[in-house]
């Protein structure tokens, strides 16, 4: 069969461009190791069908704990070992102190003016100071103790009302407790539209995380519309903005006393005093951070802790015995009575090791072209620290995949980012500023659920039949809701 000249030229052209796309250009630049890539999508095909944190971990085991990934048009460095985490988050902490701009941050976080996504600079430094001294200080977290105790007691009563031997949706109950605590901490009272607010936050969380088309092709604006992402986010933002505006208006009329300042009180005081350059949108973005980020991470941690304990009857028996001995039949739990219980805290630390709330942390972005340990890194390269892989590194953790709270008994490892083999809240300048609040919102709900009830799986299932499948979003949640049968 004859082939026309036009066809030959077209085929030759296609082959030429495929060759140019598939072959790496020869250059004197030192490049990080990476998997083989495809045109346009880069390395995305290696991650299709995987949980991102697990897929990236598997690639790192093959190509190295410091590797490069091309995610669509986004160039990214992936760190998957304590050694490289320490090197980059200390030596290169400032060069990688920025956050990449995202469609979600632009629309939901009021043009990236919240604490998590704000670009590195004076505004972010002031926000960080605000968190340390006002919003998330130990004193402020302590001031919300009575809220936590009251809402945890409400959950206990709800479980009892459902009846001994009747399956109870713990996923729903835990999320509700933490969401209500945080909304009361923010606004001083239960939100009239609490259910609507919670549903909006859940919508945001569903739209966040993973490798969305808008995140891997940030410059292709038409894809943001074509995928429906921009429309969905705009709809969520409009509902959220209206709700928060109403809450702020109500709060301005009946604000709390200086002694019992809510988070919103603090922000409005600073805004009105002009000692900090806050706009109305900035206030809303920060409040959303307090509520959205705190609810999802804490509720996921409590769920995973109970899930692991169900699958490990030895640990469940031990932590419940500790609680019951310490509390000695008390009707209601006070926070200070359980804060220093050794085994309860070991359970929480081990849960955070196996199930860090943000397994890929929040990505950072390089602020300038630089040389990293002999490798050339372009400006705006994304930095992904896979704490999921780091927390399970077999070089640092014996039986790394096993749930074993006792591994921390004689360990000086802390959660505060100083030990790079254990980074549940990240490390460096952009480490999560809400760790104290997050831990308080994990410890007390978990203690209440374990102290008052014995738990088993429905329908006589054995403990090892609990489904531990993950669902990836803003955080890694259980794919199926945690339905357990209480007895009391």
Curated annotation (Swiss-Prot):
Coiled-coil regions listed in the entry: none
Residues in compartment: Lumenal: 24-488
Family: Belongs to the cytochrome P450 family.
Needed co-factor(s): heme
Upper classification of the organism: Eukaryota, Viridiplantae, Streptophyta, Embryophyta, Tracheophyta
UniProt KW Heme keyword: yes
Binding site for heme: 432
Catalytic activity: (+)-(R)-germacrene A + 3 reduced [NADPH--hemoprotein reductase] + 3 O2 = germacra-1(10),4,11(13)-trien-12-oate + 3 oxidized [NADPH--hemoprotein reductase] + 4 H2O + 4 H(+)
Protein name (Swiss-Prot/TrEMBL): Germacrene A hydroxylase
Keyword Endoplasmic reticulum applies: yes
Cytoplasmic side: 1-6
EC identifiers of the protein: 1.14.14.95
Annotated tissue distribution: Expressed in leaf primordia.
Record: glycosylation sites: 169, 260, 379, 412
GO molecular function, one term: heme binding
InterPro entries linked to this entry: Cyt_P450, Cyt_P450_CS, Cyt_P450_E_grp-I, Cyt_P450_sf
Membrane-topology annotation of the record: Single-pass type II membrane protein
Location of the protein in the cell: Endoplasmic reticulum membrane
Pfam families with a match to the protein in the record: p450
PROSITE patterns on file: CYTOCHROME_P450 (PS00086)
Function, in words: Involved in the biosynthesis of germacrene-derived sesquiterpene lactones. Catalyzes three consecutive oxidations of germacrene A to produce germacrene A acid. Could also catalyze the three-step oxidation of non-natural substrate amorphadiene to artemisinic acid.
Transmembrane segments: 7-23
Keywords attached to this entry: Endoplasmic reticulum, Glycoprotein, Heme, Iron, Membrane, Metal-binding, Monooxygenase, Oxidoreductase, Signal-anchor, Transmembrane, Transmembrane helix
GO biological process: sesquiterpene biosynthetic process; terpenoid biosynthetic process
GO cellular component, one term: endoplasmic reticulum membrane
């Amino acid at each position: 069969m004859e082939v026309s000249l036009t066809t030959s030229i077209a085929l030759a052209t296609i082959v030429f461009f495929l060759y140019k796309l598939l072959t790496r250009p020869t250059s004197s630049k030192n490049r990080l190791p990476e998997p083989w890539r495809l045109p346009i999508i880069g390395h995305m095909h290696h991650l299709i069908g995987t949980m991102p944190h697990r897929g990236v971990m598997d690639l790192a085991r093959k190509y190295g704990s410091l590797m490069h990934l091309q995610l669509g048009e986004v160039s990214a460095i992936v760190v998957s070992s304590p050694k490289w985490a320490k090197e980059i988050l200390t030596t290169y902490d400032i060069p990688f102190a920025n956050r990449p701009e995202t469609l979600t941050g632009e629309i939901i976080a009021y043009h990236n003016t919240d604490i998590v996504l704000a670009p590195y600079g004076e505004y972010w430094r002031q926000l960080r100071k605000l968190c340390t001294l006002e919003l998330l200080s130990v004193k402020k977290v302590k001031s919300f103790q009575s809220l936590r105790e009251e809402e945890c007691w409400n959950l206990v009563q709800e479980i009892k009302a459902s009846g001994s031997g009747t399956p109870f949706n713990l996923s729903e109950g835990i999320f509700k407790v933490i969401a209500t605590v945080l909304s009361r901490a923010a606004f001083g009272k239960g939100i009239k539209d609490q259910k609507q607010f919670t549903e909006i936050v859940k919508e945001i969380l569903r739209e966040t995380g993973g490798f969305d088309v808008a995140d891997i092709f940030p410059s292709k604006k038409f894809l943001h519309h074509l995928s429906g992402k921009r429309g969905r986010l705009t709809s969520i933002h409009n509902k959220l903005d209206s709700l928060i505006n109403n809450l702020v208006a109500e709060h301005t009329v009946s604000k709390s006393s200086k002694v019992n300042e809510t988070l919103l009180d603090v922000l409005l005081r600073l805004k009105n005093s002009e000692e900090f350059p806050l706009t109305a949108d900035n206030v809303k973005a920060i409040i959303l951070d307090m509520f959205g980020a705190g609810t999802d991470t804490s509720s996921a941690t409590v769920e995973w802790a109970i899930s692991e304990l169900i699958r490990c009857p030895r640990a469940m028996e031990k932590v419940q015995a500790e609680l019951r001995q310490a509390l000695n039949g008390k009707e209601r739990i006070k926070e200070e009575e359980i804060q220093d219980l050794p085994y309860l805290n070991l359970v929480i630390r081990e849960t955070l090791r196996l199930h860090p709330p943000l397994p890929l942390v929040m990505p950072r972005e390089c602020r300038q072209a630089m040389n990293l340990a002999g490798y050339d890194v372009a400006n705006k390269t994304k930095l992904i620290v896979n704490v999921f892989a780091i927390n399970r590194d077999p070089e640092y953790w014996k039986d790394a995949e096993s749930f074993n709270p006792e591994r921390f008994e004689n360990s000086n490892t802390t959660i505060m980012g100083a030990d790079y083999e254990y980074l549940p809240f990240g490390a460096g300048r952009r480490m999560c500023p809400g760790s104290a609040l997050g831990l308080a919102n994990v410890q007390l709900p978990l203690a209440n659920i374990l102290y008052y009830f014995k738990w088993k799986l429905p329908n006589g299932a054995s403990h090892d039949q609990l489904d531990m499948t993950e669902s990836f979003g803003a955080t890694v949640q259980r794919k199926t809701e945690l339905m357990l049968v209480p007895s009391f």
